[in-house]
Amino acid sequence: MRCLIFLCSGLLLSSHLFACTSAVISGRATRDGRPILWKQRDTGTLENKLVYHTGHTGHTGSTYAFLGVHNADDSANAEMFMGSNAVGFSIINTASYNLAYPQYKGKMDEEGILMKRALAVCSTLAEFEALLQATKGTRGVEANFGVVDAKGGAAFYETDPYSFIKYDANDPTVAPHGYLLRTNFSASGTPERGQGYIRYQTETDLFQWGFLGEGLSVNFILNEATTCLRHSLTGVDLARGPLPESAATPSIVSFADFIVRYSTTASMIIQGVAQGEPASLTTLWTVLGSPLTTPVLPVWVQYAEQIPPQLFAGHNRSAALNAASLRLKDRCFPLKVPEGKSYLDFGKVMNREGTGTLQKLRVVNALLVKEGTRLLEKMRSAKVTDPDVRQSYQEMMNAVGGYYASFGVDL
């Protein structure tokens, strides 16, 4: 009964307000021993861009180079919402809505500012904890911060303006299976408040199945979690139900409180490094748009200059890849009234002809992961050059362009 109350309380709250889904996975829980950090980002700002920040050394101190996702309209690149730096420190967040800090009267929603600062100056979990101590009483955040580092560290930090509580994914008493999940409430917060209880239950069921089955991996999260079409409260699984005949078959379905939904603007699966590997091998498997309409691309801080320009953007513009994703996504949500965001034309996503956006996406994603993994293995053996990276990206972008061209969308 208590679980049902949790689920219903989440259902009654807004579905689209900074409602992210995430996971911190220690190396002891993954198939290859490398930690994974995942964030499915939901926000009202649909346009995204990838941004590379160069490091520097000066009289006021040094900063690391780092790479991650910003809102497209962030002309000053002041807020980063998920990313990694040159020494393998990676960070994500989900907003929390059940922490208490009544004495704080300052500005809130500064999570992106704090994460950008952390990427610039932190190399380990311990240094992030020192940053949290240094910003006590001045940081306007209410969030679950997920962090991994190149030393095998993996943890969530439930954080308000004054305090934080660490949940260590390497501690068997905290994470018996080696992984931790968060949506939009904190375990240390007020029970039955917050948001995302339905998504949390869906995620819990999904990860338990994955952990006991094929194992937790980049492929598992990409194929099973980012595009999960199961609803844990109603029991609906759109992918397993009767599919519409074709993309042209009218097939409007209710689409609220799924892990992926209208407000999902990006997803990032950050694959850390094994013990003894260079931190530069940390890989950001990046979905720069809706997971229903956006192919995944691997990016690395050390090869930032080789990343295709379609992932970056000019002044106050979304990246070209993100813009193409949004144009295709627009067809999947044909109702343009405000409540239309909760109704999906499912035939556009999956159908019996196999022409849905997700069906074609799974084919191209398999090719992209294969090529990205091949390139990563060359990096691990120190046998890769800048021309190799450029050639690999060219092949990947040809596949991405072909995906959008099949729907008549220009990239």
Model-derived regions, located:
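Cleavable N-terminal signal peptides
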Residues: 6-7, 17-18
